[in-house]
Each structure stands twice: as structure tokens, then as C-alpha cells.
Amino acid sequence: MHILIATDAQWVVNEVKAALDSPSTTFAVLSNGREVAPAVAANTPDIAILDMQVGSMGGMAITMDLRLDQSSGALPKVPVLMLLDRVADVHMARRSGADGWTIKPLDSLRLRKAVTAIAGGGCYAEGIPTPDLEEETAEEAVAEDATVTEEVAAEAVAAADTVAQ
């Protein structure tokens, strides 16, 4: 398995590697969010693990950038696990198009469980803060948000076309 990690915090790299390292696992570690899309284009990972805060381009912006490039066919679909700082960030993770998220502090069991689910084509969600959403499965939440993300991406492309004219 090839895992891309985007974070500027060495402790996050250490935690993720400790939880997921195996003889068949390789890691690409990036400390600048702007490097993620080119890295995906060069060597598509099985999963991208994105810290919510990564220098000048955080996990939400990185995920939205990836999803926009994927919707245009410029990049292949890459499953994204976002590492959130707090429960309040769940809304942003859902809206960005992430396939799953976990809330820090990290632990090996939850990381392995999340990566297994997401890399296998599923979803993983923690900390959905509103009672009416607790019954919604992670897959339903991500599917709903993917539609919203596609609509936002289409609006962004239309706006860019208008500006270009």
C-alpha cells in the first residue's frame, strides 16, 4: 500500500507511520499542501491522509483541490482520510469531499480501522456532532456531500470561465 501523508507536524507523521507501517507499505510525506496534487499525479497513492492544518493550504483546501481535478479527469480518484483538530471541523471535512475523518488525538487502532475502510472503498466518520445526523451512515453523509462538492466545483468552473471571457 502506498500512503501519502500531508502534514507539517512531525508527530503526526510519526503516529501515522507507527500505526500503519508494514513491509508492504510505502509513504510519501509532504509538508506543503500545494505539493499534494503533483505528488498524486506522479505516483497515485492508495490513500491520502491529510492533516487539517498543513502550512498555507490545509486539508480541506487540499481535498477540494483534489476533487476538482478528479472531476475534470486531471487526476485519478484518491481516497482521502482527514485528520481533524476538533469535532467542530467535521462539517468542513464533510463539505470538502473527504472519504473519512478521525479526530485527534490519534491512536493506532482508529487509524488502521479508518484506513482499512477508506482504502477498501468505504467511508469512516467520527464525531458527527448533531443528533439528527447520528443515524446517517458515513457513506450516506459522504455521498450527499460529494453531490454538493460536485455542484460547488461546477459553479467554480463556470465562474472561472466567465472571468476568462
Where do the PLM segments sit?
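Conserved acidic segment of CheY-like receiver
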Residues: 1-20, 48
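Short hydrophobic/Thr-rich beta-strand motif most characteristic of the beta2 strand and flanking loop
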Residues: 24-32, 39
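Conserved phosphotransfer microenvironments
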Residues: 46, 50-68
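Two-component signal transduction core modules
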Residues: 48, 101-102
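Alpha4 helix (beta4-alpha4-beta5 surface) of REC/receiver domains from two-component response regulators
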Residues: 61, 82-101
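His-Asp phosphorelay/catalytic-motif detector in bacterial-type signaling
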Residues: 71-79
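C-terminal output helix
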Residues: 106-115
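CheY-like receiver
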Residues: 122-165
